[in-house]
Regions:
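Beta-strand signatures of extracellular beta-sandwich domains
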Residues: 52-56, 106-108
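Short solvent-exposed strand-capping/beta-turn motif centered on an Asx-Ser/Thr pair
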Residues: 41-46, 99
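A generic structural signal for short beta-strands and their flanking turns/coil linkers
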Residues: 33-37, 49, 68, 90-92, ...
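Intrinsically disordered, low-complexity Pro/Gly/Ser/Thr-rich segments with frequent PxxP/GP/PP motifs
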Residues: 59-93
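C-terminal interaction-tip segments
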Residues: 1-33, 38, 97-114
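Hydrophobic beta-strand residues in large extracellular and virion-surface proteins
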Residues: 51-53, 94-96
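Short edge-strand/loop segments of extracellular domains
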Residues: 56-60, 114
Length: 114
């Protein structure tokens, strides 16, 4: 089976912890997973921001922090996941919110892993 790589993007992310921006939702299927390979956040604004990245586990109906309130200076980016891998089961989500909406997110994902 060929590898199925995908990039997921978000811009102007949520500023509310109660309704974070969904960057990616893993494929639904008991035999399929996705692997988060890299996740970068960039501050596109004129002030420093704090960024929170979560994995929402659909089976537990709970969210778990990858990073919480990480500072990202003006004109900078933060490599949240780089090198290590995070397995996402069916319907798990990558979610992001920040102290200002001036954040872009890029995620690189390997889909349909059995």
């Amino acid at each position: 089976m060929a590898n199925n790589f995908k990039n997921a993007f978000a811009t102007s992310v949520s500023t509310t912890s109660g309704s974070p921006t969904d960057v990616y939702t893993s494929n639904n299927g008991s035999a399929c997973n996705s692997i988060l390979i890299e996740l970068d956040v960039a501050n596109t604004g004129t002030s420093a921001v704090q960024v929170t990245v979560l994995i929402r586990d659909s089976s537990a109906n709970a969210a778990f922090h990858i990073v919480k309130n990480a500072p990202v200076p003006v004109g900078s980016a933060l490599k949240v996941v780089s090198g290590q891998k995070v397995v996402l089961n069916g319907n798990d989500k990558i979610q992001v919110y920040a102290s200002a909406a001036t954040v872009d997110v890029v995620a690189s994902i390997l889909q349909d892993v059995t």
